[in-house]
Amino acid sequence: MTATPLTNLFLRAPDITHVAPPYCLNATWQAETAMHTSKTDSACVAVRSYLVRASCETSGTIHCFFFAVYKDTHHTPPLITELRNFADLVNHPPVLRELEDKRGVRLRCARPFSVGTIKDVSGSGASSAGEYTINGIVYHCHCRYPFSKTCWMGASAALQHLRSISSSGMAARAAEHRRVKIKIKA
């Protein structure tokens, strides 16, 4: 099997123009079962649940940060398939090494990014107008002290990584568009 050049990967990346700062999810998961386990946030008035879809090869407890991502200035959310493609790209080993290089720390997990969902449902008797579902990118962490300063520094590095990769995808598509225009004129 031949390796896919990174430029081709960036051309296929979804068009993500905005990555919001991290939101810490008030729950923990067992890494082995996090792919299909939904957790409910007991601190919320409404019923709020989190699905992180983490596929982790490391065992133990994980905690997560959620990043809302949008495709344009109108805050159009990407489709789940686009989010999966983006998570696959940022988890691609050469791309993930960039995050490790920025942090100066080796990650304990080969796939720290996944597609996540926050679902908020109004309490009984309330109107359905307050219900919402947000899909985005989740970064999970294995550190011993959830949401400590070190953990937040990792989430901040993950935010910068996501923003950098989304910018690289937009730049690759713009360059390809210019190449196509030049070929057509020639």
Swiss-Prot record:
Keywords attached to this entry: Host nucleus, Virion, Virion tegument
One Pfam family of this chain: Herpes_UL55
Keyword hit for Zinc-finger: no
InterPro entries to which the protein is assigned, alphabetical: Herpes_UL55 (IPR007622)
Localization terms from the record: Virion tegument; Host nucleus matrix
Transmembrane region(s): none
GO biological process, one term: viral life cycle
Single GO cellular component term: host cell nuclear matrix
Primary location class: virion
Family listed: Belongs to the alphaherpesvirinae HHV-1 UL55 family.
Protein name: Tegument protein UL55
Natural source organism: Human herpesvirus 1 (strain 17) (HHV-1)
